[in-house]
Amino acid sequence: MHNQAPIQRRKSTRIYVGNVPIGDGAPIAVQSMTNTRTTDVEATVNQIKALERVGADIVRVSVPTMDAAEAFKLIKQQVNVPLVADIHFDYRIALKVAEYGVDCLRINPGNIGNEERIRMVVDCARDKNIPIRIGVNAGSLEKDLQEKYGEPTPQALLESAMRHVDHLDRLNFDQFKVSVKASDVFLAVESYRLLAKQIDQPLHLGITEAGGARSGAVKSAIGLGLLLSEGIGDTLRVSLAADPVEEIKVGFDILKSLRIRARGINFIACPTCSRQEFDVIGTVNALEQRLEDIITPMDVSIIGCVVNGPGEALVSTLGVTGGNKKSGLYEDGVRKDRLDNDDMIAQLESRIRAKASQLDEARRIDVLQVEK
């Protein structure tokens, strides 16, 4: 119902992480990272599957040891979502997980050894068609750059990133994406802006170590929102000191808010006041939990009175406008029914599920007609 945002995406090259296209206009991929011990195969698999259920396109797994690499082999066999192996210092781990079917390597070429070891990893990645993510972080800048700049700056992060890019360029390897993360919003944003002007490769966005569920979501929404609104970014991760599942939910909420990528229900709800005719807050909270399984994109407005309710309902897939004892239900901008305020949650859940099924069937028919 609402128009898509007129955001002009930055042009970038195309790579694939497993079967997920990255860059060159592909949908912005949302990813997270496991926080289990990788050697605990069962716990890690369970967490990855939980991330899959809420829509994760890609999942990163830390592989710090050879034991973790052996566990990675077993994990990879039990999940469907593409996996990125996060590797530092030991090039042999990168070679090992490449044998085990890793979909992407997250490394910094500068910290896995000498030129020959870098070449071995890159040659292996090329032979097995595995992309690489260069991950620069303000908290782990090279010592000489810390001394040169005195502190992490956008120019320092850019210089670090370009060093790693140059490593891959010298080896004639172009299947990579880059990130320049920082916990400071403005440092991260300016670093990405500078990098976006220097290279054509896809960019992975993130505000690193953003904080807990609430503060981290706010920082990420501001930082990623600024970049995405400028067309910068091909994949993203919302880094939270919280359940990784929340990272995926917040990531999609950011994309939905910018009308870049829709997944599931976009709830539009008033903050409530004394004019509300039913429990708006309780209704929204209950429906968000009950309807997490719905992936059909739709706007649902839940407004407690007639001041703004009708206007929001006009541009929503489904909309409720609070009234005395009964509230008006709108579908595609047209008033269709009245719902009992005392049974609002159950009635609205039923209507939303029915509408989702209707929209899914309509899209299925459209696809079949196109294929004919």
Curated annotation (Swiss-Prot):
Top-rank taxon, per record: Bacteria
Positions annotated to bind [4Fe-4S] cluster: 270, 273, 305, 312
Top class in the EC scheme: oxidoreductase
Free-text comment on the cofactor: Binds 1 [4Fe-4S] cluster.
Pathway given in the UniProt record: Isoprenoid biosynthesis; isopentenyl diphosphate biosynthesis via DXP pathway; isopentenyl diphosphate from 1-deoxy-D-xylulose 5-phosphate: step 5/6
Coiled coil region boundaries: none
Protein name: 4-hydroxy-3-methylbut-2-en-1-yl diphosphate synthase (flavodoxin)
